[in-house]
Amino acid sequence: MKSDNKLLTMLSKLGVFVLAIGLITGCTEQRGEKSADLVYVNWAEGIAYTNLAKVVLEDKMGYDVEITSADVGPAYTAIAQGDADAFMETWLPVLHADYYEQFKDDIVDLGIVYEGTQSGLVVPEYVTIDKISELNDHADKFDGEITGIDAGAGIMKTTNQLIEEYNLDFDLIQSSGPAMTSALQRAIDDEDWIVVTGWKPHWKFGRWDLKFLEQDEDKVLWEKGNIHIMGRQDLAVEKPELANFLAKMHLTDPELADLMVAINESDEDNEVVARQWMQDNEDVIEAWIPADAQEAGM
């Protein structure tokens, strides 16, 4: 039975991978220069600025835009094969370093959309430890578990390395971004101890009092970095206006936090909230749009 379950799990994961590629593949077929096919991961910040990019391109520049959610691996594959125009969320220099090294010859770095990322293990402020090296002394309070996200995420790979490096007596639990924040919500409501894989930017830091556990100086696996937008190799030639727009797109920490909280707290569709944010922050987006493109979109 265990073997059958493992086989079903493998087939299920393969099916999801094929489905993701199938959704992405062909997006760019028979679509013109005034089209954009953007891929993002189902993480709070990616959802926020990908939907923002969509409404700006549509409303201000007259584009036909398709956005597709996919796991990190299929997203890189899509732009490397030219089946999508851009992947909106590459974390460098650490989290996506392996993916970037694998695909860098077939993709183009369009620029930084957000500066100052931070990743690591996150706990509520009421948890009375401050360092990763203190986790084992309190493993029972955490039920010996670190609540993670989707398996293909770079933060999951690094956390597995960290468990070995610090010799932690913990299991890394695979879930998803939304499942992780739900677990965090339940724990905080009851003031239970919980440790999760966390990153900034993320709306959870605006909702709850949280802290990153400190790394030992000789065991630093996470560094601060930036979020880049990666494009297909020929994007600047085939769609120069789109490439220029994506290269100029940039959000500060307060701007992105404001957008993420607005999306998370609203019952409206993400696109509707992003459009309202765009209308309320015209001064932010004007810098991204060429004057002639802005006129064409009006």
Describe every region a protein language model picked out:
Residues E45-A48, Q161-F170, S175-D189, N226, ...:
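An extracytoplasmic/periplasmic, membrane-proximal ligand-sensing/linker region
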Residues T50, A70-K104, S182-A183, W203-W208:
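Pocket-flanking alpha-helical
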